[in-house]
From Swiss-Prot:
Known function: Nucleotidase that shows phosphatase activity on nucleoside 5'-monophosphates.
Subcellular location: Cytoplasm
Protein source organism: Hyperthermus butylicus (strain DSM 5456 / JCM 9403 / PLM1-5)
The protein's name: 5'-nucleotidase SurE
Top EC category: hydrolase
Single GO MF descriptor: nucleotide binding
InterPro entries assigned to the protein according to its UniProt record, in alphabetical order: SurE, SurE-like_Pase/nucleotidase, SurE-like_sf
Cofactor(s), names only, from the UniProt record: a divalent metal cation
HAMAP family membership: SurE (MF_00060)
Reaction(s) catalysed (UniProt annotation): a ribonucleoside 5'-phosphate + H2O = a ribonucleoside + phosphate
Gene name of the record: surE
C-alpha cells in the first residue's frame, strides 16, 4: 500500500512553517505526496471554509527543489481543493506539525491543524494531526534530535494507518509531542481534557480612545491521564483518537429524550399559542 499511497500534507501555520517541512520529510517516502498549504498562517480556523471570496492556488519551490502548492484558503478549504485538483481519493491526510500543542477539547474544536484532518475524516479519508508543545518555530529547527525523533514517530504512525486504516470507531487521530522528544520518550494513548485554558478578556483602548478586546488564557491544572497532562506534565507523546460523532452517547439517548420532553412541550405550546392568537386577531 505504502508505495502507491496518495498522501496529502497540509497545516495551518502556513507554507513557510518548519513544521510543514518536518511533516513532508517524514512521509515523503511512504507514497506519492502532495503538499498544499495556506500561503499565510490560519491558526484557530477550525473547520472554517471560505464562502465569501474566490479561492486560488499557486506553485512555489521551497526546501531546495521541492514543488509545493499554496492557497489563500483555510486548512479545511485545502481538503476540497486537493480532491478537485490532485486526486478524488487520498489514502491519508496528515496535518502539521503545528507550532504549539493542540490538547484538550477546548483547543481541538478551534484548531486549524485538526480542522484539516477532521474535514478529511468527514469525507471518509483517514486524517492525522500532529502538533508540538513549542512556542516558536525556531525551537523546532534548533533541536535536531527532537526533529529527527518526531520524524520517526510521524512516519511510523502514518505508515501504520496506511496499512491498517483507522481503528474501528475512530475518525481521526491527534498526536501531540512534548517540547523535547528523545529515544526514551514514552508514547501514550490519552483522552482529550475538557479545557486547557481559563479564558480571559483584556479590555484596552487604542490611541484614539476606542475600546478593543484581547483574548488570552491561563493554564488550568490538567487532569491526570488527559492529553494535556501527558504532554505537559509527563513530557510524553499523547495519541488521542477522536470521533466526529457529536450526538449524545447512544446509551444515554433514552434518558436525554425523557429529560428534554418538557422543553419540547414548551416549544410546541409556544407555537400553538401563536397560532391561536393569530386566529383570534383574524
Amino acid at each position: 500500500m505504502a508505495s502507491t499511497a496518495k498522501i496529502l500534507v497540509t497545516n495551518d501555520d502556513g507554507i513557510h512553517s518548519p513544521g510543514l517541512r518536518l511533516l513532508y520529510e517524514a512521509v515523503k517516502e511512504l507514497g506519492r505526496v502532495y503538499v498544499l498549504a495556506p500561503e499565510t498562517p490560519k491558526s484557530a480556523s477550525g473547520l472554517g471554509i471560505t464562502l465569501h471570496k474566490p479561492l486560488r492556488i499557486g506553485k512555489v519551490k521551497i526546501w531546495g527543489d521541492t514543488m509545493v502548492y499554496i492557497t489563500n484558503g483555510t486548512p479545511s478549504d485545502v481538503i476540497y481543493i486537493a480532491i478537485e485538483e490532485f486526486s478524488p481519493r487520498f489514502d491519508v491526510v496528515v496535518s502539521g506539525v503545528n507550532i504549539g500543542d493542540n490538547t484538550s477539547i477546548q483547543v481541538i474544536l478551534s484548531s486549524g491543524t485538526i480542522g484539516a484532518a477532521a474535514q478529511a475524516a468527514l469525507l471518509g479519508i483517514p486524517g492525522i494531526a500532529f502538533s508540538a508543545d513549542i512556542d516558536e518555530a525556531s525551537q523546532l529547527e534548533e533541536d535536531r534530535e527532537t526533529w529527527e525523533n518526531m520524524k520517526r514517530v510521524i512516519r511510523a504512525i502514518t505508515s501504520w494507518v496506511l496499512e491498517h486504516g483507522m481503528p474501528e470507531g475512530v475518525d481521526l487521530i491527534s498526536v501531540n509531542f512534548p517540547r523535547k522528544v528523545r529515544k526514551d520518550t514514552k508514547v501514550k494513548i490519552a483522552p482529550a481534557a475538557r479545557i486547557k485554558f481559563l479564558q480571559k478578556v483584556s479590555v484596552l483602548y487604542d490611541p484614539r480612545g476606542r475600546k478593543y478586546y484581547w483574548l488570552y488564557g491561563t493554564l488550568v491544572e490538567p487532569e491526570p491521564g488527559s492529553d494535556v497532562y501527558v504532554v505537559h506534565v509527563e513530557k510524553a507523546i499523547a495519541i488521542t483518537p477522536l470521533s466526529l460523532n457529536v450526538n449524545v452517547k447512544e446509551g444515554e439517548w433514552a434518558a436525554v429524550v425523557e429529560n428534554i420532553k418538557p422543553m419540547i412541550q414548551a416549544a410546541e405550546s409556544a407555537l400553538r399559542a401563536q397560532t391561536s392568537a393569530t386566529v383570534s386577531t383574524a
